[in-house]
Swiss-Prot record:
Record-linked Gene3D superfamilies: 3.40.50.740, Dimethylsulfoxide Reductase, domain 2
InterPro entries according to UniProt: Asp_de-COase-like_dom_sf, MopB_CT_YdeP, Mopterin_OxRdtase, Mopterin_OxRdtse_a_bac, Prok_molybdopt-oxidoreductase, YdeP_MopB
Needed cofactors: [4Fe-4S] cluster; Mo-bis(molybdopterin guanine dinucleotide)
Residues that hold [4Fe-4S] cluster according to the record: 49, 52
Domain of life: Bacteria
Described purpose of this protein according to its UniProt entry: Probably involved in acid resistance.
Expression triggers: By EvgA.
Record's protein name: Protein YdeP
Note on cofactor: Binds 1 [4Fe-4S] cluster. Binds 1 molybdenum-bis(molybdopterin guanine dinucleotide) (Mo-bis-MGD) cofactor per subunit.
Similarity field: Belongs to the prokaryotic molybdopterin-containing oxidoreductase family.
Molecular function terms from GO: 4 iron, 4 sulfur cluster binding; formate dehydrogenase (NAD+) activity; molybdenum ion binding
Length: 759
């Protein structure tokens, strides 16, 4: 693997994407059979991409797949296997020395495994033995709240519903979830602002908008199929503006792999009409600057007898809190706005002008907005900006959070939450006849804190790589090994499985692409995309191993063993997933006619009250919510210090590392790098390719023991006073205390650091 730093000249997509897909397929898949499966991905009679949550178009192409979707499916359907013979040759201690890419690249898990501390190896056991032993451990705990039930966003609606049902009959609301680490500020912030913790737009709105503002996200890597929608809106004359600390190729220009003309002529579509490199942690200052300009210009228009710049009728009829917001933003000083955002008043005025001129605006955002100590307030400032011009609840306008995992939104909809509503719990009671717990449980940060303090005794993970995804993994690694029980439901080996508890199990499950055969026949599961569309997913491939079970079957097996007197007919439900969906419909009225509607091509849309200008808030209206000050990360407020954000590489999806390249950013064969601007490198007196150390700072600005040594400097077009490193390697630079108090999300995108040359 050749290591090099070399500027990539191509557009996003194009032949570079095609070559990358070909390499992924060649290295992982049985071409004779499995490539055919890609033609069934994201199709009504096929399976949903296990990657991102971008919605499927109503009229999809014959090959509706993106580069990273192809990598995800190649990773899943690999013909490599991790079985008993693999573990006979590799102890857990030896596997801990492997890289995270190497661990998952070893192949698919194909049989139930139990850790044996004498041999330091995982050894096979029968499914029933695994269920019985896990059930016995769960029965032994005096307090159900000693168990943490983690969920990954790849889990289907059906499996997630059964999982929460099991945990609540067990009498726990401990539901740490991957969304706690990515879009929890969306769920919390939007619910408070507009009454719905989800986005308000549909894919069709991109066909009607005048302007799309993309802030804090990187579609070329994290949701590449979005580029097709951005290309289409630019082609018809609408504008897209990008706001991001780094210049990301997927926001700049795109060659559509499905477009023969662009591919054959090497032509491309310019996406962003303007690009603003806001400093890391400067979004709130920028947004308040935009709102201040809009209000001042609206006041001037009013005084001159010109038409209002804002939507006064909408503000008066549909909102509360505007006067308080107005006072706050008008009191924000320009010198502070410019210093914190890194943008001049002139640049911010350009943004405000573009927004003022557009009749219909969509704001798309990702974790660059949410993963801050004030991530919830960040989201709410985006809503404030939209509300000022009535851009919620009309065609071609709205808020568009870009979710990660393909069903992370659906899991929450069907009950994966540590704070369930009383109405939801009452309906569970009515349907099943047991009284679920009402006290709030643990989200991700509280869950890890409970593990670190010894309060938690067991961890069950429905997918994911919990230990690697969390902050401060050095502090949490030993407590994880001191748990009494760890159960990992997974398709591939990862580092979390190697931090073995007293009793550790790995339970292998089917992938999204594989046929799920139950007593009534082949089953479909359902997922919810970022725009609240529910659709079916049906595996088409032969399972990787004869012993694999579905997630639904695994949940039912554990539940039956742990709850011998259960009132739930677990086996009956798993025989036919229509029965699970009937129960979901009974508990959640918005799923009316669930089984009928998922049989329609494309599925159905869950009602979004805010999109219809029905405000399910305590005020009965949309709320302008003021956030005091301009800092979205108070612990980073040291003027002389650098701020570091963690990001994915292009060969990566969440904690899964497909390869060692980051093509669009020009990094190949390596991940031990730190990105900085040429201006910042000059200030720090370092050059491209030199090695440096980063030291994390405490909240009072002192050097901590958390550090990253010998990172290679990569000079990159980006904001100054900002550094970027790769997730999850840099997660340990953040403590469990560095999180948003409203949503609990860790501040992965704003870690104060110092830089020094490496010896």
């Amino acid at each position: 693997m050749k290591k090099k730093i070399e500027s990539y000249q191509g557009a996003a997509g194009g032949w570079g994407a095609v070559k990358s897909v070909a390499n992924a397929v060649r290295k992982q898949m049985d071409i004779r059979q499995d490539v055919i499966a890609m033609f069934d991905m994201n199709k009504p009679e096929g399976f949903d991409c296990p990657g991102c949550a971008w919605p499927d178009p109503k009229h999809s192409a014959s090959f509706d797949i993106c580069e990273n979707g192809a990598k995800a499916i190649a990773w899943e359907v690999t013909d490599k296997q991790v079985n008993a013979s693999f573990f006979a040759e590799n102890t857990v201690q030896s596997l801990l020395t492997w890289g995270d890419h190497e661990l998952e690249a070893a192949g698919r898990l194909t049989q139930p495994l139990k850790y044996d501390d004498v041999s330091d190896c995982y050894k096979p056991l029968s499914w029933q033995q695994a269920f019985d032993e896990i059930g016995a451990r769960l029965q032994s705990y005096s307090d159900p709240n000693q168990v943490e039930f983690y969920t990954s966003g790849r889990t289907s609606n059906e499996a997630a519903f059964l999982y929460q049902l099991f945990a609540r009959e067990y009498r726990s609301n401990n539901f740490p979830d991957c969304s706690n680490m990515c879009h929890e500020p969306t769920s919390v912030g939007l619910a408070a602002s507009i009454g719905v913790g989800k986005g308000t737009v549909l894919l069709e709105d991109f066909e009607k908008c005048d302007l799309v503002i993309c802030i804090g996200h990187n579609p070329g890597t994290n949701h590449p199929r979005m580029l097709t929608s951005l290309r289409a809106l630019v082609k018809r004359g609408a504008k897209m503006i990008a706001i991001n600390p780094l210049q990301e190729r997927g926001l700049e220009r795109f060659t559509a792999p499905q477009n023969p003309f662009e591919m054959l002529t090497n032509s491309e579509t310019q996406l962003a009409s303007a690009y603003y490199n806001v400093r890391i942690g400067g979004d709130m200052a920028l947004l308040k600057g935009m709102m201040r300009l809009l209000i001042e210009r609206d006041d001037a228009a009013s005084a001159a007898g010109r038409p209002s710049l804002l939507d006064d009728e909408f503000i008066q009829t549909h909102t509360v809190g505007f006067d308080e917001l107005r006072r706050d933003v008008l009191n924000s000083e320009w010198k502070d706005i410019e210093r914190i955002s890194g943008l001049s008043q002139t640049q911010i005025a350009e943004l405000a002008d573009a927004y003022a001129a557009a009749e219909r605006t969509i704001i798309c955002y990702g974790m660059g907005i949410t993963q801050h100590e004030h991530g919830t307030q960040n989201v709410q400032q985006l809503v404030n900006l939209l509300l000022m011009k009535g851009n919620i609840g009309k065609p071609g306008a709205g808020i568009c959070p870009l979710r990660g995992h393909s069903n992370v939104q659906g899991d929450r909809t069907v009950g994966i939450t540590e704070k369930p509503s009383a109405e939801f719990l009452d309906r569970l009671c009515e349907r099943y006849g047991f009284t679920p717990p009402h006290a709030p449980g643990h989200a991700a940060i509280a869950s890890m804190q409970a593990i670190c303090t010894g309060q938690a005794r067991a961890l069950i993970c429905m997918g994911g790589n919990f230990a690697l995804a969390m902050p401060d993994r050095e502090a949490s690694a030993v407590p994880l090994t001191q748990l009494d029980l760890a159960v990992h439901v997974a398709t591939k080996l990862n580092r979390s499985h190697l931090l073995t508890a007293r009793h550790s199990y790995i339970l292998p499950v089917l992938g999204r692409s594989e046929i799920d055969m139950q007593k009534s026949g082949a089953q479909a599961v359902t997922v919810e995309d970022s725009m609240s569309m529910i659709h079916a997913s049906r595996g088409v491939l032969k399972p990787a191993g004869v012993m694999l079970k579905s997630e639904c079957a695994v949940v039912a097996g554990i539940a039956q063993a742990a709850l011998p007197q259960s009132v739930v007919a677990w086996e009956y439900l798993v025989e036919d997933y229509d029965r699970i969906r009937n129960d979901i419909e009974a508990v959640l009225p918005e799923f009316a006619d669930y089984n009928q509607r998922i049989r329609h091509p494309g599925g159905f849309h869950l009602i979004n009250a805010a999109a219809e200008r029905r405000w399910m808030t305590s005020s009965g209206k949309a709320n302008f919510i003021t956030s005091k000050g301009l800092l979205e990360d108070p612990s980073s407020a040291f003027n002389s210090k650098l701020v570091m954000a963690t990001v994915r590489s292009h060969d990566q999806y969440n904690t899964t590392i497909y390869g060692m390249d980051d093509r669009y950013r020009g990094v190949f064969g390596q991940r031990d790098v730190v990105f900085m601007s040429a201006k910042q490198a000059k200030i720090c007196r370092v050059k491209n390719g030199e090695r440096v150390n980063l030291i994390a700072l405490t909240p009072d600005g002192k050097r901590s023991s958390r550090r990253m040594d010998r990172l290679k400097v990569v000079i990159y077009p980006m904001a100054d006073r900002s550094l970027v490193t790769y997730f999850p390697e840099s997660n340990h630079m953040l403590t469990l205390d560095n999180h948003d108090p409203l949503s609990g999300i860790p501040g992965y995108k704003s870690i104060p650091v110092e830089l020094e040359p490496s010896n």
